[in-house]
Amino acid sequence: RAALGITQLKRINKINELRKNASLYYHKNLQNIPGIILPDMVNDKSHSYHLYTIRVTKPFKLSRNQLFKKLKNNGIRTTVYWMPIHKYSAFRKFAKVSNVVNTSKIYNEILALPLFPTISKKHQDSVIKVIKSS
């Protein structure tokens, strides 16, 4: 595994560039869909583009879970990451419901679209098509 990691590190700039380009493609093609909130793409900042996570909000015709199922039924894997810490049994006693309203709201809206260095435009187009047709 260490050998794989070292090999990946040698190509990290190329990998990040591929992920960035795929993120920009999603961003360009998913703009202006009511109820779909895209991640901020700040020109003077850089990151690894590890995920492309959208928010599915009320103006959109489907809930996040409904969109998740529709994408899955079309052979597209999406993921919901980062369960709020107050949902874990070990931390539940520390959270007051009134203090975690936004956390719960965001958690119920987020959906990570497929994103990996070798993702094709064809694959992305199928994701975009399902979202736009919803």
Task: Tell me what each language-model feature is.
Residues 1-134:
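PLP-dependent aminotransferase class I/II
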